[in-house]
From Swiss-Prot:
Principal location listed in the UniProt entry: cytoplasm
Family annotation (InterPro entries): Amidohydro-rel, Metal-dep_hydrolase_composite, Metal_Hydrolase, Urease_alpha_N_dom, Urease_alpha_subunit, Urease_AS, Urease_asu, Urease_asu_c
Top enzyme class: hydrolase
Residues annotated as binding Ni(2+) 2: K224, H253, H279
The enzyme's E.C. designation: 3.5.1.5
One example of a Gene Ontology biological process annotation: urea catabolic process
Protein name: Urease subunit alpha
Record keyword Zinc present: no
Residues in Urease domain copies: 136-577
Family recorded in the similarity comment: Belongs to the metallo-dependent hydrolases superfamily. Urease alpha subunit family.
Binding site for Ni(2+) 1: H141, H143, K224, D367
PTM note: Carboxylation allows a single lysine to coordinate two nickel ions.
High-level lineage: Bacteria, Bacillati, Actinomycetota, Actinomycetes, Mycobacteriales
Length: 577
């Protein structure tokens, strides 16, 4: 029997069980816990494509037709990083959905082939060997200010956006709201052309139940309560009353100035009901200085936006100018300046790092063009994980020492932009993880570029975005290699591989017949019983206290000191600008 060293095996087929992979230039390492595609248990039967390799006629490729159940696409030998684990496997895709995770090939001559991974003449191959596969990212906080954000989102590995807007209107620049049935219809039609799942939020700042039901029938999948529209206790209660009846989620940006009440009053108005708290730390807005305390409540689903991720020596300086622009404020007006300065507190931004690391803040979004960068959701998440490993060391249950694996930490952080927002907004029956039955919204990463630039973004089973060289070159790889749209990004393909998530009431009311869209409308699941306990690996409920005068933060009684990072991975090493 021929023996292969681990290094030679990894060069041929990719890493296997027990091998560790560094994520970009961070200090984070992940370890493969199982190899379903080869490795120690199935060595010699790996499915690999290429000249002189396995997946050829009457060898690794069998005779199974599509009618026999052959997959449309197989991703070979990828390392799956998801909230449920870190394994290596072949992934089968059929009709735009994941059909199997296991061993692909030809069962006539190969052992252990999964019955739904029988490679036939109708099967395309994407080489995942040596690469990391994650679920497409979900940006849970998007201002739809300009259509160009779609390209930036795809280029950052995002395949679903949750938010609202109508373009560069003042309401949209400040709030993630698509108000009213007419705007909802036009935005659903406009967004039909991009390879991106869409979740639009209607305006929840009203005590008019009729207005909110009208928006749900018009295509809203939930609501946004924003202080710039007046997040009063009465509006909070009215919005959540409709949400409870409809089964949809509400996202909230609370009252920074405490004009309508304090954080305790907002929590009283919420009344123990499920709610998604945007930018829970507060620099993006919310009760000053203690909105961060809501992350300790079991009914509140807290998220961050990426401009404060992680806390660095530059975070405070850039925030003041961003805030003035985003909320239509003027530096020359003292009251406007005081409003802005009250929101930016280094102590709460620093505490936000720790709350992410212990799993108390469950999600990360962008706040795109409204104090955040849509293309940096994934990158900022992993920068935070790196900073926390350097400061706190390995999590309990992870490996110790310089080369110890960080599997728990990696699974916790990937969940923040995949499964957690999917669960929070009732999307997890369709997206949010690499699991059988879900849409094949997947991202392949070269380990050296993990979290920075995807190798390929697969949307509903089609490659929609990829790193690609000069189109006039003789091969695909000559420089400049840039993230570029692929055939899956064409409007007709995008409509076939993406969905609009809407409230069940919209489907029941015949919205599909009233608007000009080609893609499928999918009802969100009932989320009214979703609480922090349903946030995978991000369900911690610490006691959080903020001193009103000094802004000192205590988490479970201990002060978390400010130590802003002066250097980050995944930064200038990868970018010219």
């Amino acid at each position: 029997m021929t023996a292969l060293s681990r290094s030679n095996y990894a060069a041929l087929f990719g890493p296997t069980t027990g091998d560790r992979i560094r994520l970009a230039d961070t200090d984070l390492l992940i370890e493969i816990t199982e190899d379903r595609s080869g490795g120690p248990e199935l060595a010699g039967d790996e499915a690999v494509f290429g000249g002189g390799k396995v997946l050829r006629e009457s060898m690794g490729q069998g005779r199974a037709t599509r009618a026999d159940g052959a997959p449309d696409t197989v991703i070979t030998g990828a390392v799956i990083l998801d909230h449920w684990g870190i394994i290596k496997a072949d992934i089968g895709i059929r009709d735009g959905r994941i059909v199997a995770i296991g061993k692909a090939g030809n069962p006539d001559i190969m052992s252990g082939v999964h019955p739904d991974l029988v490679v036939g003449p109708s099967t395309e191959i994407i080489a995942g060997n040596g690469r990391i596969l994650t679920a497409g990212a979900i940006d849970c906080h998007v201002h739809l200010i300009c259509p160009q954000i779609m390209d930036e989102a795809l280029g950052g590995g995002i395949t679903t956006i949750i938010g609202g807007g109508t373009g560069p209107a003042e309401g949209t620049k400040a709030t993630t709201v698509t108000p009213g049935a007419w705007h909802l219809a036009r935005m659903l039609e406009s967004l039909d052309s991009w390879p991106m799942n869409i979740v639009l939020l209607g305006k929840g700042n009203t005590v008019s139940a009729d207005s909110m039901w009208e928006q749900l029938r018009g295509g809203a999948a939930g609501f946004k309560l924003h202080e710039d529209w007046g997040t009063t206790p009465a509006a909070i209660d009215a919005c959540l009353t409709v949400c409870d009846a409809a089964g949809v989620q509400a996202a909230i940006h609370t009252d920074t100035l405490n004009e309508m009440g304090f954080v305790e009053d907002t929590l009283a108005a919420i009344g123990g009901r499920s709610i998604h708290a945007y930018h829970t730390e507060g620099a993006g807005g919310g009760h000053a200085p203690d909105i961060i305390t809501v992350a300790g409540h079991p009914n509140v689903l807290p998220s961050s936006t990426n401009p404060t991720r992680p806390h660095t020596v530059n975070t405070l300086d850039e925030h003041l100018d961003m805030l003035m622009v985003c909320h239509h404020l003027k530096p020359s007006v003292p009251e406007d300046l005081a409003f802005a300065e009250s929101r930016i507190r280094p102590s709460t931004i620093a505490a936000e790092d720790l709350l992410h690391d212990i799993g108390a803040i469950s999600m990360i979004g962008s706040d795109a063009q409204a104090m955040g960068r849509i293309g940096e959701v994934v990158m900022r998440t992993w920068q935070t994980a790196h900073v926390m490993k350097r400061r706190r060391g390995a999590l309990e249950g992870d490996g110790s020492g310089k080369n110890g694996a960080d599997n728990l930490r990696a699974r916790r952080y990937v969940a923040k932009y995949t499964i957690c927002p999917a669960v929070a907004h009732g999307l997890d029956h369709e997206i949010g993880s690499v699991e059988v039955g879900k849409l094949a919204d997947l991202v392949l990463w070269e380990p050296a570029f993990f979290g920075v630039r995807p190798h390929a973004v697969i949307k509903g089973g089609m490659i929609a975005w990829a790193a690609m060289g000069d189109a006039n070159a003789s091969i695909p790889t000559p420089q400049p290699v840039l993230p570029r749209p692929m055939f899956g990004a064409a409007p007709a393909a995008a409509a076939a591989t993406s969905v609009h998530f809407v409230a069940p009431q919209a489907i029941e009311d015949g919205l599909a017949e009233r608007i000009d869209v080609r893609r499928k409308l999918v009802a969100v699941k009932d989320v009214r019983k979703v609480g922090k306990a349903q946030m995978p690996l991000n369900d911690a409920l610490p006691r959080i206290e903020v001193e009103p005068d000094t802004f000192t933060v205590r988490i479970d009684g201990e002060v978390w000191d400010e130590q802003p990072a002066a250097e980050l991975p995944m930064a200038q090493r990868y970018f010219l600008f």
